Amino acid sequence: MEATAKFDFMASGEDELSFRTGDILKILSNQEEWLKAELGSQEGYVPKNFIDIEFPEWFHEGLSRHQAENLLMGKDIGFFIIRASQSSPGDFSISVRHEDDVQHFKVMRDTKGNYFLWTEKFPSLNKLVDYYRTTSISKQKQVFLRDGTQDQGHRGNSLDRRSQGGPHPSGTVGEEIRPSVNRKLSDHLPLGPQQFHPHQQPSPQFTPGPQPPQQQRYLQHFHQDRRGGSLDINDGHCGLGSEVNATLMHRRHTDPVQLQAAGRVRWARALYDFEALEEDELGFRSGEVVEVLDSSNPSWWTGRLHNKLGLFPANYVAPMMR
C-alpha cells in the first residue's frame, strides 16, 4: 500500500521511521495506531494519524488462505484479494479467482524493494494491481484482475481513513492541526492511580509484532526472495490443473529443505529456462545441470555453471544427490 505523509515525523525509537511531509511511504503491515512502513531502504513504525492512506477493497491483510478461497469462490473470474502470506511473515500473497478454482501467488520482492509476480517489477502493490488489470496475470489463460471498483468509478473505499487520535479541523476551514503522537506501549512507564486524569485518553496498547528473521547474506547484498515463478508453494494446497502446478508437484516430492536433512544438495537439474536479469544471478536452460554451492536458503540457491557463479530460484531446479 502507498501512503502520503501529512506532517513531518522524527523517530524517537530504534524501531520507528522518520519522514517528511509529502513523502510517499510503502505500508508493509497495519498495526492499529502504528503502521510498519518503508521509505527508501529504511523500514520502521510510523504513527497512523501522521499519514493519509486508503486501504483498497482488495486488501485483506488478516485473511487466511482458506478464508480467501471461500470469499472468492462466489465471485466472478478475475476477482482477487491481497493478504499477508501465512508461510512467509512480512510478505504478501495474491489470491485470484480462476475459471475452476482460486489460485494463490506469492508476491516476491527484490533487493530494491520492488514487488513482482513474474519478471515485471513494480514499486508498490498498487502499481502491480494496476498492471494486471490490463495484462493477464495467468500465463496460460486470459485472467485480468478486477474488484468491482471499475464499475463504481473510484479506486476502493477508505477503511477508517482517520483514526480516532487523528487530526481534527481547526477554526479555519480546510486547515488541520498537527496531531500528537500516541506513543507505543513500550515508550510509557506504568501510570499509578493518582497520575491518571479522568479526561486523559490512555495510550494505545501497541507492541510491535515479532520481526521476521533476517536471511543469510548472499554475494554481499542478497537479503530476501527476489523474483521468478511466484506460486505461494508453502502457503497450502493448490488445486491440480493450474499453470504452476508442475513446480508445485515437483517440490512436494523433492523439497530442498527435506533433501538437506538427508545430505547437502551438490547438483541440480534445471526444470525450466531461467533468464538472469541481475548481475548476481545465474541463468540456465531447461535440462542443464548446475553445481550447487549453497542451498541453505529455501528460495534462492548459489550455483555455478559454465564457470559463472550466481543466484537462481530453487523451485526452477530438481536437486540431484550424486
UniProtKB/Swiss-Prot annotation:
Residues 58-149 form the SH2 domain. InterPro entries: GRAP2_C_SH3, Grb2-like, SH2, SH2_dom_sf, SH3-like_dom_sf, SH3_domain. Its main location: nucleus. The keyword Repeat applies. Keywords: Acetylation, Cytoplasm, Endosome, Nucleus, Phosphoprotein, Repeat, SH2 domain, SH3 domain. Residues 193-204 have a biased composition (Low complexity). Disulfide bonds: none annotated. The modification Phosphotyrosine is found at residue 45. Pfam families: SH2, SH3_1. The keyword Secreted does not apply. The modification N6-acetyllysine is found at residue 106. The modification Phosphothreonine is found at residue 254. It comes from the Eukaryota. The modification Phosphoserine is found at residues 186, 230. PANTHER family: PROTEIN ENHANCER OF SEVENLESS 2B. Belongs to the GRB2/sem-5/DRK family. This is GRB2-related adaptor protein 2.
